[in-house]
């Protein structure tokens, strides 16, 4: 299997290297040696190399896309080295090994987010992907299909659950069900007469209406989206052409209406 490791505290470094071509044509081994040379002595001691994303290959100073099989004297690469804390990597590997699965490669979760939604239009532009996860929210910036930077916000769907549990004195499992099946993401899109009955921690049956539930959910979701919006501005100074939002929280009723209110309508 190929596993994705958490993106938090991942580091991105611009790298470059060049090698002399000794054979008749450039081989896969030449490319592998070039990439290895580009990261030599650049990975910090408590970090693990994840991948190198090539930005440009050059043969004798001329840009090329597919270099294997071509001829030349000097091969050069310019790319982005991605490394992650060893604890992020080994914690995931230990789980996979415990499940009896053989790990053949590792990647950062942000790359997986991109390849889930990738298309020709995204490959040509600069944009951001926001993954609203259970415990964390990952914000990643891509330039023409290349991951340029990523950051993790330590808030996610579980915080919505905890907000509901605290405000209504209910357990977090009931809170999660209310979030998924009853709440709306925006107070303009609610059913005024809908009521949800649930037992609180004292064993009493209470009745919740959509207005009070949605106000709590909307406040937390708006906070998450605004933090993600701010993080995009911190990750890149370039104008972005798209924002993709993924994750379980996007399934809450009227989520797109809240997104449009905060980001505008250029959101997938």
Regions found by a protein language model. Give the residues of each.
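Nucleotide/phosphate-binding catalytic cleft detector across ATP-hydrolyzing
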Residues: 1, 5-127, 147-148, 171-172, ...
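A conserved active-site cap/scaffold subdomain adjacent to cofactor or substrate pockets
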Residues: 154-173
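A short acidic Gly-Thr/Ser loop motif
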Residues: 5-6, 129-136, 142-145, 154-158, ...
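Glycine-rich phosphate-binding loops at beta-strand->alpha-helix junctions
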Residues: 186, 239-262
């Amino acid at each position: 299997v190929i596993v994705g490791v958490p993106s938090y505290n991942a580091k991105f470094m611009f790298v470059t290297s060049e090698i002399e071509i000794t054979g008749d044509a450039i081989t896969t081994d030449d490319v592998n040696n070039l990439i290895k040379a580009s990261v030599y002595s650049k990975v910090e001691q408590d970090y693990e190399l994840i991948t190198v994303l090539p930005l440009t290959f050059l043969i004798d100073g001329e840009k090329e896309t597919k270099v294997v099989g071509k001829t030349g004297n000097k091969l050069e690469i310019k790319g982005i080295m991605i490394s992650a804390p060893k604890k992020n990597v080994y914690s995931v590997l230990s789980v996979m090994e415990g499940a009896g699965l053989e790990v053949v490669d590792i990647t950062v979760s942000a790359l997986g987010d991109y390849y889930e939604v990738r298309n020709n239009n995204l490959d040509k532009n600069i944009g951001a992907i926001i993954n609203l996860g259970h415990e964390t929210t990952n914000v990643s910036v891509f330039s023409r299909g290349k991951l340029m930077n990523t950051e993790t916000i330590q808030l996610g769907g579980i915080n919505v659950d905890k907000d509901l549990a605290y405000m209504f004195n209910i357990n977090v499992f009931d809170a999660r069900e209310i979030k998924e099946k009853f709440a709306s993401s925006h107070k303009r899109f609610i059913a005024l007469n809908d009521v949800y009955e649930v037992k609180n921690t004292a064993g009493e049956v209470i009745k919740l209406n959509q207005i009070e539930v949605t106000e709590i959910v909307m406040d937390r979701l708006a906070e998450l989206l605004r933090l993600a919006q701010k993080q995009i501005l911190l990750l890149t100074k370039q104008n972005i052409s798209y924002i993709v939002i993924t994750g379980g929280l996007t399934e809450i009723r009227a989520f797109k209406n809240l997104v449009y209110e905060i980001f505008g309508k250029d959101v997938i």
